[in-house]
């Protein structure tokens, strides 16, 4: 996939002042961003997160998933390290889009799990594409990453694209009674590497 670099700016956040870089896919015109901190183009491996858009979790504080919590923790971790990158990819709902995600949530309210809901709507369990990541990283001078993820399939996808993932850094945050079944399905059906917890009834404090 080809992407075009558009522009950069400073982005002050509660975690520090990041540089925000805008990219656009050639053909689809879909927009993606990269948030960077520190010297990332020195050839050393960079702490990284590829984060697919989740309006409900990232902006509306939904507890149905762990996305918003992972976004916060990834930015905190990058800030603590003093350097790193977060690729924010516009592929809502594991690639099915926001309105279809709402339809999938409705099916989950009726008893389907997150994979079954996608399949009942005629979609694959995970329709995300990471091919835009390599040219974005290349533009920013990054060739080796330490990837914050619980998803080994994401590691495999990036590796097949020619991105050197030197380490998988677990990112287990945000577990609560509302997403207990969702996380269990991600582990059982999507292969995510998640720890078994004894505190299922623990309610995560509001962010």
From Swiss-Prot:
Its cofactor is Zn(2+). Its EC number is 3.5.4.25. Belongs to the GTP cyclohydrolase II family. It comes from Hahella chejuensis (strain KCTC 2396). It catalyses: GTP + 4 H2O = 2,5-diamino-6-hydroxy-4-(5-phosphoribosylamino)-pyrimidine + formate + 2 phosphate + 3 H(+). HAMAP family: RibA (MF_00179). The keyword Transit peptide does not apply. This is GTP cyclohydrolase-2. InterPro entries: GTP_cyclohydro_II, RibA, RibA-like_sf. One of its GO terms (molecular function) is zinc ion binding. Catalyzes the conversion of GTP to 2,5-diamino-6-ribosylamino-4(3H)-pyrimidinone 5'-phosphate (DARP), formate and pyrophosphate. The active site is at 126 (proton acceptor), 128 (nucleophile). Gene3D superfamilies: GTP cyclohydrolase II. Binds 1 zinc ion per subunit.
């Amino acid at each position: 996939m080809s992407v075009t670099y558009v522009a950069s700016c400073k982005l002050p956040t509660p975690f520090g002042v990041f540089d925000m870089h805008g990219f656009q896919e050639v053909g689809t015109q879909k927009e993606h961003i990269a948030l960077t901190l520190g010297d990332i183009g020195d050839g050393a491996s960079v702490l990284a997160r590829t984060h697919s858009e989740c309006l409900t979790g990232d902006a509306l504080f939904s507890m149905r998933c762990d996305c918003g919590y992972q976004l916060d923790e990834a930015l905190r971790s990058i800030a603590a390290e003093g350097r790193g990158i977060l690729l924010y990819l516009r592929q809502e709902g594991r690639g099915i889009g926001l309105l279809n995600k709402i339809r999938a949530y409705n099916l989950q309210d009726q008893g389907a799990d997150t994979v079954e809901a996608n399949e009942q709507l005629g979609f694959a369990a995970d329709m995300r594409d990471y091919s835009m990541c390599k040219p974005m990283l290349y533009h920013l001078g990054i060739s080796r990453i330490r990837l914050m993820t619980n998803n080994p399939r994401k590691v495999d996808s990036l590796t097949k694209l020619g991105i050197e993932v030197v380490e998988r850094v677990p990112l287990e945050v945000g577990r609560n009674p509302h997403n207990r079944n969702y996380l269990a399905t991600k582990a059982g059906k999507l292969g995510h590497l998640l720890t078994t917890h004894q505190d299922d009834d623990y309610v995560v404090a509001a962010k």
